[in-house]
Each structure stands twice: as C-alpha cells, then as structure tokens.
UniProtKB/Swiss-Prot annotation:
The modification 6'-bromotryptophan is found at residue 34. It comes from Conus radiatus (Rayed cone). Disulfide bonds join 2-16, 9-21, 15-26, 20-33. The cysteine framework is XI (C-C-CC-CC-C-C). This is Conotoxin r11e.
Length: 37
C-alpha cells in the first residue's frame, strides 16, 4: 500500500514508514517524514 524507495511520490505520507518524499521519490530517513507535525 505504501511506496518504497525510489517510487514516485508527491507527499511524504505516500511513502512507507521512515521514508520521506524528496525530489519526487521516496527515500529512507531516520526521522521518518510520515510523522511530520
């Protein structure tokens, strides 16, 4: 359901846990952008 690394995205929430949407692709992040305030 969620998107893994290198998959296209437009929002952090589209990416799997501990991943952020940067430059249109999901990328791993230790902070996990999915919990952004």
């Amino acid at each position: 359901e969620c998107k893994t690394n290198k998959m296209s995205c437009s929002l952090h929430e589209e990416c799997c846990r501990f991943r952020c949407c940067f430059h249109g692709k999901c990328q791993t992040s230790v902070f996990g952008c999915w919990v952004d305030p």
